[in-house]
């Protein structure tokens, strides 16, 4: 510990002496570490060096001497892995425990944060952008989404500065507008991860306008099947980039000949692509042939993919939504301009095609091909990373888990179980065991993991069909956040002792597990014990406020206690997270009907004050979670007192009469 402290002290001392050039070099080192982490866990190919050797060579005095007889530095690697994962736990949500070299991400986050606090960081306009990117990568390895925080607002300010620079420098306006488009797009993706789809949609449209992308979703006559004789109107996306559709990007992106493998449909009825007939139209894109449109800039392709995701997130999943998304994907996949962009397009197409019998086979094989290509070096690293931050590309383990989910959908449960076991995604593995009629085996699996019972790997393979030796790991090797999730999973499975297991999860996490608090709140809510349900759900939303169902149950519990102001605050948060939640709107109206003027005025005043102060979720997980006192919605901008001092009734009225809620929807 002492050598390590001296090493960090030297680093901080040097940071105080940075000049502009040195600050830029430090930023470059942080970005390199961030991209090395991304390369290992997202884009591939695998690196030829490991983080432990690199850190040892950079600061040998900060690490204990290595055993010369050992083939690998396993002890140091395990210690760094555990410490890094503990650092990356945020708002009670653990990072994926099998991610590669998390110390690289920790290093990047710490260096970027130190630069932001240093006076030299002011002279680095792009520092804000890289902090947002690092935070986005961090949040994408967490089990559940969390708030990004105020750093997103600074990226919005940077986008505004880029727009003004485009207006002031006419000769370089295209370059400035391109940067503005990227900033708007990445901010929109971050908001979309938090569930703010409406705000994200506006940013995606603004990104398209900034980069000069023109697009229109329209209809054109065409044929979709091989034996179709008469043309019918087909949905098509007409899109055109500014200028020649590539400018300086074209040579850079098309120079790489290797692109992700696109599997053919090979169906005896459906055509590979819709055959369109050119027809006259009055739109600005009337000059485009629907079946032979020009290539798009890769950035414009990223915008269209983001809009496609936004359609899925804001509309119910039915045939019309699928057709609309397919039109966007067909336009992007028509021209392979970049490895990562094309991979993202193929991934989204696979998700859509899994819903149809005729295309499910290609969807599964295509996803398998995407998983297999990750570790290969068949394309340049620069090309894979160039547009990574402008995409919602899944990490390696998430794509493998998605493949397992497709196997499970097709009924290939044993293959799905093998993948889940290899990835140590125990919740999904237990679900597969239940579908195989082996629910008790799932309970035993989780219990073995928590209590560290020794089971040989070959026994695990034979008896539980899971090719992993993770069950040999003793409990102390689990991080507190991960152990808490396992206890919650055991509570889900062992219903008779659920409350005991959830409480154990809360204690193990040192009062930082949103999952445990949500589970306890839901358990008491199902029992009709609304007072403890309110307390636990309030703890849950203070730690992580992005779960609509937690807010909804909190509002219903407050209605059961006739605390109308608290209930209204919770339902307002529900409607802010999901504007189409009709039950929350209904219950919100019911709360307002039962509030007197003083209560309504207090609610409005508190919300306005919170909005003026820019209230948001506190980033310190431990401090927010360890408090025993509860508040309705700290990060929703609402903090109110109880409506009455006298004890509230223990259960709500069932109908609309009397003093009970007019609409009490529990699900």
Language-model features, listed with the residues they occupy:
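Short coil turns that delineate tetratricopeptide repeat
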Residues: 212, 454, 510-511, 545, ...
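Long, acidic/serine-threonine-rich intrinsically disordered regions with weak helical/coil propensity
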Residues: 197-204, 257-381, 387, 556, ...
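Single conserved hydrophobic/aromatic residue that forms the stacking wall/gate
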Residues: 1-12
